[in-house]
């Protein structure tokens, strides 16, 4: 049905399925359904340790800059590769079309979808790890998987292995949104989470499109493989100095 109609279908799903679901099923706080933050029965000490901060105060804390810039470069690398993944698949010669249940599926589209499926799994997987490990560890695993996935899908010309690396790439970037919010939650507490996430966008959003422009320009210059490798190298650099506090006090 073409890319444009596919996006139209996505838009209709958001309007008629996701928005009503959010309206009736998403809660504001765990207490609404008889649960507790971080599964702690005694919330008094937890809540008293979290002071509501002024927006300008976020910029005074080094951990705010570290988390924001680490994920800014992670999104930079992810966006540059993900946007151009179908074109890269075609350049690798993955042009075959399969028929499944009467629907034609191109190899390029399947690989792209497999990366997206990895993204869904990554959200659940890294959310699980974040509850059970020091927050630094899931973030490092996530970014390492994104980097490994990028290097693999760039260098491999076997389609089966290529799709596996696409999935690994998806696992990595899929956990990014979950882990970024979790990192800010660990550092600044639940009372400041909404504000700090919004302020961090001032740093993250301007950086994110750079990867897309860089890789797109590299495609025009027939240097996109080098740009993919650069995206793979940027990802691990972004978490080199990411060290989070072990409690919600900054």
List PLM regions with ranges.
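Intracellular juxtamembrane helix-capping segments at the cytosolic ends
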Residues: 175-188
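A late C-terminal transmembrane helix in Major Facilitator Superfamily
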Residues: 192-219
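Extracytoplasmic gate region of multi-pass secondary transporters
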Residues: 62-119
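Interfacial helix-cap and linker-helix signal at transmembrane-aqueous boundaries
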Residues: 1, 89-90, 129-130, 215-222
